[in-house]
Amino acid sequence: MLNIRFALVRSLLFGTFLLPGCEDHELEENFFKQPPADRVERLRRYPLTDQYKIFRYGNDRKEPPFMDLAEPIAEKGATAVPFLVEQLNSESHDIAVRDILLIFATMASSKSYDVKSDSVLMSALSSKVSAMKDKDWKDICSKMLQRIRDSG
């Protein structure tokens, strides 16, 4: 009987205090369990919010990072910009800023959106890059931002 009480208390503690803090990455993990050959194509079939979650997971938690997963999001061009700006404004972590900047750099290079002509967006990106804490990421992102400015 004591073991049952202990198990019940333990499960209540874990359920009450630990589970809410755990992040659920089932969507992302299932995506990466599938064959790698058609990942980019498969990602195109997901809605933007899920594409973004999978992209971030593949960039931040996988080695080597799956930077090519920026392509399906970048292909959406102007339709993805409001969502990405919302993500940019809600994130302060250097890695999130880097990931979002990578999508915009992919948009610029693929010409799916004229990033450099969007002065409000460029100002927001510049501000976020300037505020980055990690010097190495800040340098890398500054170069990425300059490539966007130089894109033609």
Regions found by a protein language model. Name each.
Residues L13-T16:
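Hydrophobic membrane-insertion alpha-helices, especially the h-region
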Residues M1-S11:
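Bacterial N-terminal signal peptides that target proteins for export
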Residues C22-G152:
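Extended repeat-based scaffolds of very large eukaryotic assembly and lipid-transport proteins
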